[in-house]
């Protein structure tokens, strides 16, 4: 039995999605609390699966003391002693060993650099996506990616929305990019399939909500400017009171705002007659929010939505368009974690308002890679109707 089936058997009301209309302050708080709760749950489960050691442990698995290293200024995977082989596996330069967790700073910094590695692959042959920093003209920005034909392709567009947490544009699961392969943890295989099927592409970045240092050379100017602002002195040489620096990104203050901003500034301007959405985990909540707030605009062009272990739910506040679109088995499907055979029909979920099927994998992070083949077939079939 999938988690969604178990949840529907509970005697409890489903969480509500935000009401239609633009985002409000109270809605933003509710969304953030919900997103943080899901993120904490996913992170706790992840740590239990991959790590048995304490994050603050100064010894390795052999009981040997580990040198106290400050990883925050590392800028390449090589500095950590690792590289990606031809199979997309992270391996140590010496010994070809799998990643060894030392502490959270090491893991987080390596994860940040791996994001840049994946995004560089997205911008290189054979994928060749273009990077856009939004909003234009602002110091605090986040990046999204589009295919070079995004504003010219008149036929079909594929939209990618990842889940919540530490993942950024180009990733399904950071843990898999580190502990398994880029083929399971990143969206690179999906991008290749989209290109081979002549889709234009846009890859969103819903978790990039505050300005971050751009790894390598980028971001140094903004970093120094912020430092100078904090260290200003008066005429007597006394340090002035530091101003609180707001690093939030306008239009992307939270994941739902990001979705609407990218829709208004990019997706709406695409000439594609047919639009499909692929969304993982909390990306399903963002997709629901998009339909609740831009349903009338996108209705004529939206052909299908493919979820991978989405955590969304519908409520009386969900729009009629969202409910009807999700209820159509030819337009919406959620491939959930399950021990059933890949693509096994698991029926209709009242909680989520859509049909669900087995992803062929029992672990949440693996669902996107596990169901890629039937998911693409579902999308292609939706364009024929």
Curated annotation (Swiss-Prot):
GO biological process entries: regulatory ncRNA-mediated heterochromatin formation
May I have one GO cellular component term? nucleus
* Bias type Basic and acidic residues, positions: 220-238
Q: Where is the composition biased (Low complexity)?
A: 52-62
Give the InterPro entries listed for this entry: AB_hydrolase_fold (IPR029058), Arb2 (IPR048263), Arb2_dom (IPR053858)
Domain of life of the organism encoding this protein: Eukaryota
| Cited SUPFAM superfamilies | alpha/beta-Hydrolases
The annotated region (Disordered) lies at 1-65, 220-239
Q: Which family does it belong to?
A: Belongs to the ARB2A family.
Q: Which PANTHER family match?
A: FAM172 FAMILY PROTEIN HOMOLOG CG10038
Protein name from the UniProt record: Cotranscriptional regulator ARB2A homolog
Taxonomic path: Eukaryota, Amoebozoa, Evosea, Eumycetozoa, Dictyostelia
């Amino acid at each position: 039995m999938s988690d969604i089936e178990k949840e529907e058997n509970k005697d409890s009301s489903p969480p509500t999605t935000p009401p239609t209309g633009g985002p409000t302050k109270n809605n933003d708080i509710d969304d953030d609390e919900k997103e943080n709760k899901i993120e904490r749950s996913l992170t706790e489960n992840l740590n239990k699966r991959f790590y048995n050691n304490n994050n603050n442990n100064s010894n390795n698995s052999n009981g040997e003391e580990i040198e106290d290293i400050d990883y925050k200024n590392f800028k390449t995977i090589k500095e950590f002693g690792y590289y990606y082989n031809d199979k997309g596996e992270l391996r140590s330069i010496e010994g070809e060993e799998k990643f060894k967790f030392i502490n959270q700073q090491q893991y987080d910094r390596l994860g940040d650099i791996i994001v840049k590695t994946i995004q560089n692959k997205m911008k290189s042959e054979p994928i060749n996506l273009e990077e856009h920093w939004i909003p234009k003209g602002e110091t605090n920005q986040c990046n999204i990616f589009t295919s070079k034909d995004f504003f010219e392709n008149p036929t079909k567009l594929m939209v990618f929305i990842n889940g919540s947490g530490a993942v950024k544009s180009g990733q399904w699961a950071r843990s898999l990019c580190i502990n398994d392969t880029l083929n399971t943890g990143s969206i690179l295989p999906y991008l290749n399939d989209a290109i081979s099927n002549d889709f234009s592409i846009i890859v969103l970045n819903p978790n990039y909500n505050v300005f971050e240092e751009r790894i390598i050379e980028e971001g140094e100017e903004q970093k120094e400017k912020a430092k100078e602002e904090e260290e200003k002195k008066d005429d007597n040489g006394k340090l002035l009171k530091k101003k609180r620096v707001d690093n939030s990104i306008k239009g992307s203050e939270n994941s739902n705002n990001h979705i609407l901003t990218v829709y208004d500034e990019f997706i709406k301007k695409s000439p594609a007659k047919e639009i499909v959405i692929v969304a993982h985990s909390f990306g399903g909540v963002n997709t629901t929010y998009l339909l609740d707030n831009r349903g009338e605009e996108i209705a004529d062009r939206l052909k299908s939505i493919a979820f991978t272990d989405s955590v969304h739910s519908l409520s009386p506040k969900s729009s009629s368009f969202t409910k009807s679109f999700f209820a159509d088995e030819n337009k919406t499907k959620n491939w959930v974690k399950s021990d059933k055979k890949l693509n096994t029909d698991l029926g209709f979920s009242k909680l989520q308002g859509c049909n669900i099927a087995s992803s062929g994998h029992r672990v949440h992070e693996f669902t996107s890679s596990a169901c890629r083949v039937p998911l693409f077939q579902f999308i292609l079939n939706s364009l024929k109707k």
